[in-house]
């Protein structure tokens, strides 16, 4: 209803920022083209640690492999010249909900609105590690496979922002067994969007050729946060 409920002990006239947990610092840093590794929080933290001679706190990257396996599912990359690496991880028993307050706050501080717990995870990783990701609703993926290929001339896709694009062989697409489900490195397709009823998710993390993604983005007039990260060359440790 648009009302903000404050704690009962909130004092009239007091600064509201500490009450809302907003008494924080935001660094607005202009990154030059030769330092894409500083485009994310991890990269910037590494740089600051080196300058100050401090120990870098590595992010926790451990997970249980059994939680992300899907039997009989396969990934085929038919355009390795513009997609040298593609990984897909399956997660089941998912419940779409609101992200925890701390994650919503951190995303808001970097200008990203919260959508859902699953989508917010991909955006959080983008800003923390500089790795673009995408999440597909697995129930909409046909044929139990992901195929990374060049688009067919005249092939069409409707992206998450409900825009339809006619593609050609210069465009890289992510497909299931029958159809295109994402514009690689640019935006996912509406036909596999995460929704409130999603219970199975396929997470994508990949390395795409920056020149191809940049040219496709410009030719189609379709930009996104993923494009701004994909078209930069990142150190191997920060990829995928």
Q: Which ranges hold each PLM region?
A:
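RNA/tRNA-interacting regions in translation and RNA-turnover enzymes
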Residues: 1-234, 238
């Amino acid at each position: 209803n648009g009302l903000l409920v404050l704690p009962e002990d909130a004092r009239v006239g007091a600064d509201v920022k500490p009450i809302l947990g907003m008494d924080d610092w935001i660094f607005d840093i202009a990154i030059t083209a030769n330092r894409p590794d500083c485009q994310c929080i991890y990269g910037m933290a590494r740089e600051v640690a080196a300058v100050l001679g401090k120990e870098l706190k590595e992010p926790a990257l451990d997970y249980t492999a059994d939680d992300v396996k899907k039997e009989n599912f396969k990934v085929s990359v038919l355009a390795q010249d513009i997609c040298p690496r593609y990984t897909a991880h399956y997660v089941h028993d998912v419940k779409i909900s609101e992200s925890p307050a701390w994650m919503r706050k951190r995303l808001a501080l970097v200008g990203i609105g919260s959508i859902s717990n699953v989508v917010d995870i991909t955006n959080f990783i983008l800003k923390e590690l500089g790795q673009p990701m995408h999440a597909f609703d697995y129930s909409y993926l046909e044929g139990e496979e992901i195929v990374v290929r060049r688009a067919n001339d005249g092939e069409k896709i409707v992206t998450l922002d409900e825009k339809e694009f006619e593609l050609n062989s210069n465009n890289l697409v992510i497909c299931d067994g029958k159809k295109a489900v994402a514009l690689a490195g640019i935006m996912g397709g509406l036909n596999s969007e995460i929704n409130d009823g999603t219970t199975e998710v396929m997470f994508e993390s990949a390395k795409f050729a920056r020149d191809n993604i940049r040219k496709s983005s410009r030719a189609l007039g379709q930009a996104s946060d993923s494009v701004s990260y994909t078209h930069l060359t990142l150190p191997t440790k920060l990829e995928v």
